[in-house]
UniProtKB/Swiss-Prot annotation:
Protein known as: Crustacyanin-A1 subunit
UniProt keyword Secreted, yes or no: yes
Tissue: Found in the carapace.
Subunit structure, interactors included: Oligomer; Can form dimers (beta-crustacyanin); or complexes of 16 subunits (alpha-crustacyanin). There are five types of subunits: A1, A2, A3, C1 and C2.
Similarity-based family: Belongs to the calycin superfamily. Lipocalin family.
Gene Ontology CC: one annotated term: extracellular region
GO terms of biological process kind: lipid metabolic process; response to reactive oxygen species
Disulphide connectivity of cysteines: 12-121, 51-173, 117-150
InterPro entries linked: Calycin, Invtbrt_color, Lipocalin_ApoD, Lipocln_cytosolic_FA-bd_dom
Keyword Nucleus: no
Length: 181
């Protein structure tokens, strides 16, 4: 058996999840609305390549997510998911898309109205882990000042920001069609 290339030696970054959880819980409903994926690190679970648009609807307990965009085969793709507090009481969210598995997710930093820096990591046996990072924006573009805030947040937990790949967004994207899918 071969180890997938996204499973790497080392441990998940040290994140003060308790502090973030305490700060964000009162504002959680402010995360609702549309988020565009500005950039991400290598993630085999992200099946949408371009024009990634995420709609988060908060029902008081969890977010229902509708993610749309252009898949790697060039076709429009919709994925449904949920984002909810960890069911075992750990201070982080769990993200769970159809045909996948629930994974921990931490909002490292956000102002709720412009940007969000997201980190997901799972530690495995024998000193291996998988981590995935995202930069989200409320619009198809993200001002450099907010990109820098996310870069600083990721550098603060020793995530190599050169791993990020910018997501194609903008005038070539069928956002109006995506809203109706």
């Amino acid at each position: 058996d071969k180890i997938p290339n996204f499973v790497v030696p080392g441990k998940c970054a040290s994140v003060d999840r308790n502090k973030l959880w305490a700060e964000q819980t009162p504002n959680r409903n402010s995360y609702a609305g549309v988020w565009y994926q500005f950039a991400l690190t290598n993630n085999p679970y992200q099946l949408i390549e371009k024009c990634v648009r995420n709609e988060y609807s908060f029902d008081g307990k969890q977010f229902v997510i509708k993610s749309t965009g252009i898949a790697y085969d060039g076709n429009l793709l919709k994925r449904n998911g949920k984002l909810y507090p960890n069911p075992f009481g750990e201070p982080h969210l769990s993200i769970d898309y159809e045909n996948s598995f629930a994974a921990p997710l931490v909002i490292l930093e956000t102002d709720y109205s412009n940007y969000a820096c997201l980190y997901s990591c799972i530690d495995y046996n024998f000193g291996y882990h998988s981590d995935f990072s995202f930069i989200f924006s409320r619009s198809a573009n993200l001002a450099d000042q907010y990109v820098k805030k996310c870069e600083a947040a990721f550098k603060n937990i020793n995530v190599d920001t050169t791993r990020f790949v910018k997501t194609v967004q903008g005038s070539s994207c069928p956002y109006d069609t995506q809203k109706t899918v």
